[in-house]
């Protein structure tokens, strides 16, 4: 057995924040920019060996993350500062490591997760924003956030989300368990906050697209429940844009003792 094979292997978890507006999603792909590719390149430079990361949730093109979690294995012994400050120095400005934690062998960023939480941010104003144009979704018709919240409560619990599932979704089942869904207004911002054990493809954006129709009084409050029961994607509203969506938190069993920083995005109070 070579000396290289005898080196100890370290398993490391990282919290990652990124502005997804300039990336073709999280997942590494040929010939297009991805968050995974940039992160692996920076980690490999610090480790001085090739690094492959596994994430809690693969976000789509244009979607952001403030609470993404990844893990990787390495034979490179490094201090925490190397995996945070050192990696950040090698990352583009729109991706950053928020925290680092050594984890046991049985930890997996995706398969150990018990829930994911997303926030969808709508800038509800007659005029479009400029500074946050890629960080929020603009909707000019006045929205009734309380009406949206009431309509959304039928989605709680375990349900078949076929009506809110992208046609190209590869998940084996449309059933998901929604733990909470809250719609609140913060000045001109309407925030849809949803937590579930997992999500089918485009589930949050499809739910938000239909909730905006309810909030604008284009559909009755009962419409969301009717869509859920119909199990027909063609009956629901168009998919909401990617710009307003953030993966803000991932839950894990307490025994892993992972950090829980403020969820953000930073222009919102927690």
From Swiss-Prot:
Coiled coil: none
Taxonomy, superkingdom: Bacteria
Region (Interaction with tRNA): 168-172
GO molecular function: RNA binding; tRNA pseudouridine(38-40) synthase activity
Alphabetical keyword list: Isomerase, tRNA processing
Entry EC no(s): 5.4.99.12
Keyword Calcium: no
InterPro entries the record matches: PsdUridine_synth_cat_dom_sf (IPR020103), PsdUridine_synth_TruA (IPR001406), PsdUridine_synth_TruA_a/b_dom (IPR020097), PsdUridine_synth_TruA_C (IPR020095), TruA/RsuA/RluB/E/F_N (IPR020094)
GO terms of biological process kind: tRNA pseudouridine synthesis
PANTHER family registered for this protein in UniProt: PSEUDOURIDYLATE SYNTHASE, TRNA PSEUDOURIDINE SYNTHASE-LIKE 1
Family: Belongs to the tRNA pseudouridine synthase TruA family.
Protein name: tRNA pseudouridine synthase A
Gene designation per UniProt: truA
């Amino acid at each position: 057995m070579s000396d290289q094979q005898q080196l100890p292997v370290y398993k490391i978890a990282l919290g990652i924040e990124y502005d997804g507006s300039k990336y073709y999603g999280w997942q590494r792909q040929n010939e297009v920019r991805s968050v995974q590719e940039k992160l692996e390149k920076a980690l490999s430079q610090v480790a001085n060996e090739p690094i492959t990361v596994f994430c809690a949730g693969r976000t789509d093109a244009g979607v952001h993350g403030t609470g993404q979690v990844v893990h990787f294995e390495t034979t490179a012994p490094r201090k925490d500062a190397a995996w945070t400050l050192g990696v950040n120095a090698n990352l583009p400005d729109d991706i950053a490591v928020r925290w680092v934690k050594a984890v046991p062998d049985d930890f997996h960023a995706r398969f150990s997760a018990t829930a994911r939480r997303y926030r969808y941010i709508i800038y509800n104003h007659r005029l479009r924003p400029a500074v946050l144009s890629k960080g929020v979704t603009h909707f000019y018709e006045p929205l009734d956030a309380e009406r949206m919240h009431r309509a959304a409560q039928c989605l709680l619990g375990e349900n078949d989300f076929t009506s809110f599932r992208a046609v190209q979704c590869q998940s084996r089942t449309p059933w998901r368990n929604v733990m909470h869904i809250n719609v609140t207004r913060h000045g001109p911002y309407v925030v849809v906050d949803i937590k579930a054990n997992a999500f089918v493809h485009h589930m949050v954006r499809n739910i938000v697209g239909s909730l905006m129709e309810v909030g604008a009084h284009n559909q009755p409050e009962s419409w969301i429940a009717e869509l859920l029961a119909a199990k027909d994607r063609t009956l629901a509203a168009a998919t909401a844009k990617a710009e307003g969506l953030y993966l803000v938190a991932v839950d894990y069993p307490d025994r892993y003792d992972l950090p829980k920083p403020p969820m953000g995005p930073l222009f919102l109070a927690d």
